[in-house]
Amino acid sequence: MYALSEKGERIRAMFGSIAPRYDLLNRLLSLGIDRRWRRFAVKKIGLNGAGRVLDVATGTGDVALEIASQTPASVSIVGIDFTPEMIELGRVKVKDSRHSGRITLEVAPCEEIPFDDGSFDAATISFGIRNVVDRIKGLTEMHRVLKGGGKIVILEFSTPTLPVFKDLYHFYFLKVLPKIGGAFSRFSAYQYLPDSVLEFPSRDVFKGMMTQVGFKDVRHFDLTGGIATVYVGTK
C-alpha cells in the first residue's frame, strides 16, 4: 500500500474538509468556465468505440460523468481519488445520473493505481496533477496502466502568457480567490490553490516530464488565454 508523504496527507485532509462545497465553489470561482474546459479535455480522448477509461483524481466525478456523456455506452469509466470524502459524494452523484451503470469510483492515490499494466484505453486527470507530490511517479503509473497507443489527457491550471492578462490573473488568484473561497470554506484550502498553481512547472517543463516517463507525441492546448492548459500524450 502506497504511503503518502506528510505533505500528501495534509493535501488529502484539506480536500476532505472542503469536499461538501467543492463543486459549488469551483462553479462560483471559475464562473462556470471549468465545465467548458472539461468538455474540451474529454473530447481529446477521441474514443469512439468500446473501451475503458481511467479518470485519476476524479474528485466528485464530474469528469467521469463528462466522459460517459461523450462516449458510446460500450465505454466503461473508472474514477479514482485519494480523498474518501470526495469518492463518497461522487458515488451519490453517479448513482443519481443516467450513467450509473458505466462508472465505478474507488479510493486510490495517483502514485499507486490499483490496476494491472495495460488495463485502460485512455486516462484523464483534471486539476489534480499539481496536487500529486511525486508527479513523476504519478505520470509513470498512468503510463503503466494504459494500453499501447492509449492516450493521456491532463487538464491543469496554468499561468497566462499575455502580460496584462497575467497581472490580472495573479491579482485574482493571490488576492481575490482566497477571500471568496474562505467565505465558504477553510481559508487555507483556497490559499493553497493559487500557491499550487504558481508552483506548477511551466508548459515545456511539464511536457518534458511526460516525455521522460514514456509518453510520445506530447502536445498542449491553452484555454481561455492560458488560464488552463490541456496536455495530451500517447503511450
Swiss-Prot record:
<comment type="similarity">
    <text>Belongs to the class I-like SAM-binding methyltransferase superfamily. MenG/UbiE family.</text>
</comment>
<dbReference type="Pfam" id="PF01209">
    <property type="entry name" value="Ubie_methyltran"/>
</dbReference>
<feature type="binding site">
    <location>
        <position position="126"/>
    </location>
    <ligand>
        <name>S-adenosyl-L-methionine</name>
    </ligand>
</feature>
<keyword id="KW-0949">S-adenosyl-L-methionine</keyword>
<feature type="binding site">
    <location>
        <position position="60"/>
    </location>
    <ligand>
        <name>S-adenosyl-L-methionine</name>
    </ligand>
</feature>
<protein>
    <recommendedName>
        <fullName>Ubiquinone/menaquinone biosynthesis C-methyltransferase UbiE</fullName>
        <ecNumber>2.1.1.163</ecNumber>
        <ecNumber>2.1.1.201</ecNumber>
    </recommendedName>
</protein>
<keyword id="KW-0808">Transferase</keyword>
<dbReference type="InterPro" id="IPR029063">
    <property type="entry name" value="SAM-dependent_MTases_sf"/>
</dbReference>
<keyword id="KW-0474">Menaquinone biosynthesis</keyword>
<feature type="binding site">
    <location>
        <position position="81"/>
    </location>
    <ligand>
        <name>S-adenosyl-L-methionine</name>
    </ligand>
</feature>
<dbReference type="GO" id="GO:0008425">
    <property type="term" value="F:2-methoxy-6-polyprenyl-1,4-benzoquinol methyltransferase activity"/>
</dbReference>
<comment type="pathway">
    <text>Quinol/quinone metabolism; menaquinone biosynthesis; menaquinol from 1,4-dihydroxy-2-naphthoate: step 2/2.</text>
</comment>
<keyword id="KW-0831">Ubiquinone biosynthesis</keyword>
<keyword id="KW-0489">Methyltransferase</keyword>
<dbReference type="GO" id="GO:0009234">
    <property type="term" value="P:menaquinone biosynthetic process"/>
</dbReference>
<dbReference type="InterPro" id="IPR023576">
    <property type="entry name" value="UbiE/COQ5_MeTrFase_CS"/>
</dbReference>
<comment type="function">
    <text>Methyltransferase required for the conversion of demethylmenaquinol (DMKH2) to menaquinol (MKH2) and the conversion of 2-polyprenyl-6-methoxy-1,4-benzoquinol (DDMQH2) to 2-polyprenyl-3-methyl-6-methoxy-1,4-benzoquinol (DMQH2).</text>
</comment>
<dbReference type="InterPro" id="IPR004033">
    <property type="entry name" value="UbiE/COQ5_MeTrFase"/>
</dbReference>
<comment type="pathway">
    <text>Cofactor biosynthesis; ubiquinone biosynthesis.</text>
</comment>
<dbReference type="GO" id="GO:0043770">
    <property type="term" value="F:demethylmenaquinone methyltransferase activity"/>
</dbReference>
<dbReference type="GO" id="GO:0032259">
    <property type="term" value="P:methylation"/>
</dbReference>
